Amino acid sequence: MYHPYLRGKQNELILLRENAKLLSDAGMIPIIEPVKKNLAPLEKAIESLSKENVPFILIVNPRNGDFKNDSLPLFSDLIDTTLKDYEQFCLGYIVDAESTLLDIKSFLDDNITRSISFIHNGYPKANELANVLKDFDNVKKHIFIDKKSQN
């Protein structure tokens, strides 16, 4: 399964919007990391994806951009509104060296009714994470970022 990782910049969102049918036909599942406070372009891209029934993963704890320190607007202005009736998406949660088990558990508890995908990017406590995740059947995917591909 191919998961193109997009930072949610204007050109990337236009690409998603204009190629939603192609993504659907190819079975690709894009991962979108929102970086801009203005969610209107992202909403347009999501509208195109939903028309073609394209599944996607929306990162809710971005490591870059305007939502890096406050992702609450992603929930209040997008997930709980625009996406509330669309079932073909997962909340994506990045687990890396900055992540804590307490934050991960809190996120899972807060989103027990939603589909979750974990984006693994060098999280150092894999065994402890596995113990936390075993209690949650809403975790649908684990995607691992290859450190070599980031250079």
Report the location of each language-model feature.
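Detector for Asparagine
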Residues: N11, N19, N38, N53, ...
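Structural motif
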Residues: Y2-P4, P55, H142
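An N-terminal, globular interaction/scaffold subdomain
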Residues: G27-I104
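N-terminal basic/disordered segments at the start of proteins
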Residues: M1-A26, K36
